[in-house]
Amino acid sequence: FLVNIREPAGVAILEPKNMSQKAFLPISIVGPHGLDINDESGLAYVACDAGAVVVLDLSTGHEEAVVPIEGVPDVVWLNAKRHRLYCALGKPGIIEVIDTLKLVVDEKVNTEEGAHTFTFDRKRQRLYAFLPKSCRAAVYKET
């Protein structure tokens, strides 16, 4: 299991059988928050409150990249099939889409302020964002 640790900033790797800490991987950006893993590549994507996503190699502990984002993130979701990482920012109310090959933000999807919770349906390639101010859900389809 992986767990974000706020201070010192990093990712703890836990042994699933007894939840003991196997390793701690420090990162250079404060406030690790959202986290997703690409099991095939062994990379973790750590969205941090300081306005960046850290790409971390889990086998070496090395930071492969730091991708700037527009604000404080909440949830991230990896779409490994399309090489995209979705990162929700409740303020200003967007989902930033990071190209995980080029390691840049290549799209910004408007939601609404406060919308920081979403889920991704890998089979249907749809992203569902929950919009708390308007009491709705938005559906975005990958093409």
Language model segments and positions:
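Predominantly soluble domains enriched in secretory-pathway, periplasmic, or organellar proteins
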Residues: 1-143
